[in-house]
């Protein structure tokens, strides 16, 4: 079962003006980004679990583990926002984020395992133009890595 997934930005990120502007992130744009990142995590975890031979269910029950996660310290160098101001963003990386993930007994809520990891987008030697599609591609790559780690650890536990 895939449970709650929350997303939080780096503590100063939302307060900083958008690249190339004097405008700050609108609350609705920030929420869309959080929802998109949470959706990517849910999608990739589900895909990896199913590919690994695990059944993903919607309800708690006997012998059901619940995966819950928080993406924290999310930092995006070129956020996708709806704004009249157009600014090109050049950076060495699309951004970074940290995951705090837990496996719980789905009935009792007891935490059986907890893990933390920092994921960073590919870095280049010199700044390059950051696009919205690069943001999503890099975020997906980080999240796919986390999904692979989850399945690998579940497989190792299953063998013991």
Predicted segments with their positions:
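C-terminal/domain-edge helix-coil "capping" segments
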Residues: 96, 107-114, 118-160
């Amino acid at each position: 079962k895939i449970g709650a997934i929350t997303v939080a930005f780096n503590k100063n990120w939302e307060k900083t003006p958008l690249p190339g502007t004097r405008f700050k992130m609108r609350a609705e744009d920030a929420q869309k980004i959080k929802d998109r990142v949470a959706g990517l995590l849910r999608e990739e975890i589900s895909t990896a679990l199913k590919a690994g031979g695990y059944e993903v269910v919607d309800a708690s029950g006997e012998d059901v583990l619940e995966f819950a996660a928080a993406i924290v310290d999310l930092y995006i160098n070129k956020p996708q926002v709806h704004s009249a101001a157009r600014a090109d963003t050049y950076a060495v990386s699309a951004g970074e984020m940290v995951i705090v993930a837990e496996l719980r007994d789905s009935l009792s809520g007891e935490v059986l395992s907890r893990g933390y990891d920092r994921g960073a987008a590919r870095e280049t030697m010199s700044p390059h133009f950051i696009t919205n599609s690069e943001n999503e591609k890099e975020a997906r790559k980080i999240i796919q890595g986390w999904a692979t780690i989850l399945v690998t650890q579940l497989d190792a536990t299953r063998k013991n």
